[in-house]
């Protein structure tokens, strides 16, 4: 009986079949690194210091942290939160006003920093005081057998924090739009919203939307609803979409990675948020899920 059953199984065996493409399986049940294996730039750019130099640096940091703590106490005693969001009024969050210290609020990263490509970028102030994000995209992959696609440059804001290195967030609850005043080169850039992650599986969550620039000498006023941002994890757009949690924003990034090799240039005046009371859209994407018990 068993021999006959085996023969029948061989008769019904499928040949020349193609399996579904699947992503590599996870080797762990948890994420041990917030950067998914990519090192922080400070991990290998920090210069070696002596014990005396570290003591001096720690003393200067202590003075700055005490000043931050004093400002926090003042704000808590004033108890003056934003109670009314005026329609049409833009609350500027990041502004390039010609002060070189504004560049310290941004971190530049390229594929060259992680030995994944040859692109490079800079962020500097223009003679008029605005910020200029420029560089060269190189889409030729390195011949190391590891990467097939390359060519990206990115800038990201430094995560807000309180005194003594306590984490903080940008509370944009009540705002409906992201406002930018930029002057581009005709390329398409990607805006990335980074949210505070509570669990390790959420460390690679991002919300994106495209930034279309016209090029030319004129400034461009960009108004993007938060409901237009789509959700992704590890660079893959997810089936289940939801609007970003506007009370948990920890950073904003701008990425140049449109696949076109050559120089790029994006001039930024300011980035802010606005409340539009006439806008009531919750999400621009389908939120319906079939009522199937095994739907994931």
Predicted feature residues:
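Beta-rich carbohydrate-recognition modules and glycan-binding surfaces
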Residues: 2-296
């Amino acid at each position: 009986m068993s021999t006959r059953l085996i023969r029948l199984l061989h008769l019904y065996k499928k040949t020349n079949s193609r399996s579904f493409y699947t992503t590599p399986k996870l080797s762990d049940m948890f994420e041990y690194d917030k950067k998914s294996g990519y090192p922080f730039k400070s991990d290998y750019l920090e210069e070696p210091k002596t014990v005396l130099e570290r003591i001096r640096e720690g003393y200067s940091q202590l003075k700055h942290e005490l000043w931050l703590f004093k400002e926090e106490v003042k704000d808590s005693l004033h108890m003056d939160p934003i109670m009314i969001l005026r329609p049409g009024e833009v609350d500027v969050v990041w502004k390039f006003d010609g002060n070189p210290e504004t560049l310290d609020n941004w971190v530049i990263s390229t594929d060259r920093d992680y030995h994944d490509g040859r692109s490079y970028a800079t962020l500097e102030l223009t003679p008029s005081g605005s910020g200029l994000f420029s560089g060269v995209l190189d889409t030729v992959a390195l011949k190391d057998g590891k990467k097939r696609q390359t060519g990206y440059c990115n800038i990201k804001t430094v995560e807000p924090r309180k005194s003594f290195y306590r984490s903080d967030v940008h509370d944009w609850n009540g705002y409906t739009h992201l406002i930018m005043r930029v002057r581009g080169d005709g390329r398409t850039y990607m805006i990335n919203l980074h949210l505070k992650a509570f669990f390790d599986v959420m460390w690679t969550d991002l919300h994106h939307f495209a930034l279309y620039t016209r090029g030319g000498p004129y400034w461009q006023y960009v108004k993007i609803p938060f409901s237009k941002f789509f959700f992704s994890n590890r660079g893959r757009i997810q089936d289940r979409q939801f609007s970003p949690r506007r009370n948990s924003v920890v950073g904003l990034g701008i990425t140049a990675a449109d696949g076109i090799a050559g120089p790029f240039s994006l001039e930024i005046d300011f980035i802010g948020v606005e409340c539009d009371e006439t806008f009531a859209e919750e999400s621009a994407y389908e939120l319906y899920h079939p009522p199937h018990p095994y739907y994931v």
